[in-house]
Amino acid sequence: MSKNSKAYREAAAKIDAGREYTPLQAAELVKETSSKNFDASVDVAIRLGVDPRKADQLVRGTVSLPNGTGKTVRVAVFAAGEKATEAEAAGADFVGTDELVERIQGGWTDFDVAIATPDQMAKIGRIARVLGPRGLMPNPKTGTVTNDVAKAIEEVKGGKISFRVDKASNLHAAIGKASFDAKALAENYGALIDELLRIKPSSSKGIYLKKITMSSTTGPGVAVDTHITKNYTAEA
């Protein structure tokens, strides 16, 4: 939906630009203003009161969304032997070691999440320049470098997402699909906010949640009340 299109203008007209909505109200508006041509992703953009140039304020982590993401997550697992067998049994889409590295060196990145056992990280270092910029590099902090590959696969396929603040102090995350009911979206939103508050850097001063906007992939943004940090599915 182009911002210059009639459909976009009509959708934007349904939103009070000077108002902050409850998470549930925002989810309802996002659903109402989303394109009807496809099942759009529902995203949140959050401006945090942190300075990501400081190591102790680089907000990053993971959260399991209670209602999943609505996406089919393709998982590549770097593992050998027994761990490779476990990964295959757990539903990994691609499993291997050197052969996976070689495919990626050749330009292939047709997966959404990469998981690796610790003993494979030296090999993965050869493709860090490919995986890193795409947000695909396995990392112990996000639970994607682990010997418990079955659990990691179950989590990412079940709705576990990663997030990280960017250089401009903004954080973006997908919390579901426009086909979700509004309550499910509000619950997923709440899980993300709860986790962000849990890991708030102690050195962060002033307002932490500065601005939050919820939108579909192509729809207009809806401002969410940053003061609501519980009862996310309440009407008002």
Curated annotation (Swiss-Prot):
Belongs to the universal ribosomal protein uL1 family. Part of the 50S ribosomal subunit. This is Large ribosomal subunit protein uL1. Keywords: Repressor, Ribonucleoprotein, Ribosomal protein, RNA-binding, rRNA-binding, Translation regulation, tRNA-binding. InterPro entries: Ribosom_uL1_bac-type, Ribosomal_uL1, Ribosomal_uL1-like, Ribosomal_uL1/biogenesis, Ribosomal_uL1_3-a/b-sand, Ribosomal_uL1_CS. HAMAP family: Ribosomal_uL1_B (MF_01318_B). Binds directly to 23S rRNA. The L1 stalk is quite mobile in the ribosome, and is involved in E site tRNA release. Protein L1 is also a translational repressor protein, it controls the translation of the L11 operon by binding to its mRNA. One of its GO terms (molecular function) is structural constituent of ribosome. Pfam families: Ribosomal_L1. GO terms for cellular component: large ribosomal subunit. One of its GO terms (biological process) is regulation of translation. NCBIfam families: rplA_bact.
